[in-house]
């Protein structure tokens, strides 16, 4: 069943198509800048005036008359007013606004969802190297990735969550050597503990207490499980390969605990090493060579990435024979495409910005049918943590940064998710621990969850069957607070679509805060459980629909919707 807005948009599209073939596809409503001007605004007359060589206001009058003659506008629209150079301000009948309540209650968890489009996509996120605990930056990426997956699911996509990790790089060697020295009884600060000569303030080895934990368990010959595999240490401090495998498995297990605490589950963990063992890296390189997209210079192999928009050509294979880090990335994305993922989104830190052009250049040069601009990227900044008014920089667990687990333990999973999603990904963010645990209206997650719990309390006090509310008479919902609440509910589907298209889960947090604010205003203005049965049931239906949308929006963010607080 079409929603009221969809029905009106379809009517608008039909009239625009009559005026100018092809224009119907651009049918859209906007929210008026001033609420008193109406419920929807339409700028189509101004957009079409120039190509049709007509005066925009005259065209607006023509479009207004055509729309007023359509059955849909006659059914749902109270008035269409023309303003300025050709704006159409559309005012809905009360019944149109009330209809949104029935739509929410009938569709429940699926309100705002689009039909299955029969296409699958992949979102890669977190993808932390197995060299230490997940830090708060990984937490921001985890929250972003999971919410973006949920948003795309509402738009009919089959979504695959993937975690890619580097189990074959220099950092793994550093992890292994750090663990080996700890197992031999050495510690940071000892003469044999290396320091990076180019940056003395930065230790070349890992210094966190977790390295000692790995070494202790290695010496105790313990068994760890990660990625559905088990690995047992042999306790031999000279067995470098055994130490490496045990340390990687240990930290994968620890990272899994962090992800479980965050209620985050991946469909697949993809190992970088498999790209080499399966020959995918070499296949990609040979394809680029055979296509004439490389050249040799100074003993290195270069990709002609400037042919595809990069600012300079890039080294693929160094003089020592090792590939640079973007080469396996190219091979990995070729495999993503070959696995059937027509759309891919990568969530990464802003420090990866420089890799985008070279990876896309490699994919275009590979000539396997991958479209330009593949994959999409969402880049995020790091997170600053403040507690007690002071910045927190060090974690005993990690040795040099605040971990995701620290943040969850200090606050809650819900607070971490909501807070880390409350700003655009590329915006610097300060996480205020004290605010995240405050039980007041200044805490945004508390404010939204409290609105949900408050509604549940009213529904429980009523004690009736909420399923019957979708059939009640809603004509009593006429006050300004009720009207504002219904209009906000009606915006939810379009907000989901816009947030998904823009990879912008922060839009969901803004929407929920506004919906919660409107509910609290309505609750303060109108008593729900009144003696008049018709009024009471209508108000109960409105708050029940509000509860459902609060629940749905919080679910997109991966945040719980408590019934009591």
Curated annotation (Swiss-Prot):
It catalyses: tRNA(Arg) + L-arginine + ATP = L-arginyl-tRNA(Arg) + AMP + diphosphate. GO terms for biological process: arginyl-tRNA aminoacylation. It holds the Pfam family Arg_tRNA_synt_N. Its main location: cytoplasm. Keywords: Aminoacyl-tRNA synthetase, ATP-binding, Cytoplasm, Ligase, Nucleotide-binding, Protein biosynthesis. It is an enzyme of class 6 (ligase). GO terms for molecular function: arginine-tRNA ligase activity; ATP binding. It comes from the Bacteria. Its EC number is 6.1.1.19. GO terms for cellular component: cytoplasm. The keyword Nucleotide-binding applies. Monomer. This is Arginine--tRNA ligase. The gene is argS.
